[in-house]
Amino acid sequence: MHTKVYVSEDRTKVFVLFYEAACVFSNFYPSGFEAKPVENFLKDTEKKEKLLKFTCSEQYFMYNKALLVGDMDIAEQILKETNPMKMKLLGRKLSMTKEQLKLWSQKSKDVMYRACLEKFSQNEDCRMILFRTHGMKLVEASPTDKIWGIGLDKADQRCEDERNWRGSNWLGEVLDQVREELWTRQEFKSNREQILKESLETRCQILEHFSH
């Protein structure tokens, strides 16, 4: 089970706990999309307007991190890479000044939002799963990440109470924001109407058993 759904007894709180790469909410999940680089990160005006192909949201995220640093060699390596973990490791190899680290910490959440927005707007299967979390709270149950995740494994009962979380859950927050943005778009009205016909039990079951 790549996703675990926790529903409180009074049904006022529903957490969708995820982490593994095989889960649609993971940045490693294979989901091709096209997007432009972040405008302010790229000096080449011609490339700014060019749509690039990405295989997953991790690739877009790390590619733009390399652009911010100005390391075009690593940026191109990330674009050519097909393994999400290797994309992440290439991003970690970047040599960043204190100023660049500070800027990236300020901009990274916005870059992740753009990556996820393109991923879910351009992939209907992924979007339908995301829409099934409407009214729920997405939670990256990474036991090791206290910024993008909550610092707890999804099997840990402490996940059921936000007061026990050991991380900020940035990725979960971004995904919640992306879902709400796409949910209101007229072009996805039929998707929305289909989800609204499903019971909470049906949605939870699909979320916990969805496979690529």
UniProtKB/Swiss-Prot annotation:
Induction: Exposure to P.aeruginosa upregulates expression, in proportion to bacterial strain virulence and dependent on zip-2, but independent of several immunity-related pathways including pmk-1 p38MAPK, dbl-1 TGF-beta, kgb-1 JNK and bar-1/beta-catenin pathways. Cadmium weakly induces expression in a pmk-1-dependent manner. Induced by translational inhibitors such as cycloheximide and exogenous or P.aeruginosa-derived ToxA, in a zip-2 dependent manner. GO terms for biological process: antibacterial innate immune response; defense response to Gram-negative bacterium; innate immune response. Pfam families: NADAR. The keyword Transport does not apply. The keyword Metal-binding does not apply. Keywords: Immunity, Innate immunity. It comes from the Eukaryota. Expressed in the intestine. SUPFAM superfamilies: YbiA-like. Plays a role in innate immunity by conferring resistance to virulent strains of the Gram-negative bacterium P.aeruginosa via the zip-2 pathway. Can act independently of several immunity-related pathways including pmk-1 p38MAPK, dbl-1 TGF-beta, kgb-1 JNK and bar-1/beta-catenin pathways. NCBIfam families: ribofla_fusion. This is Protein irg-1. It comes from Caenorhabditis elegans.
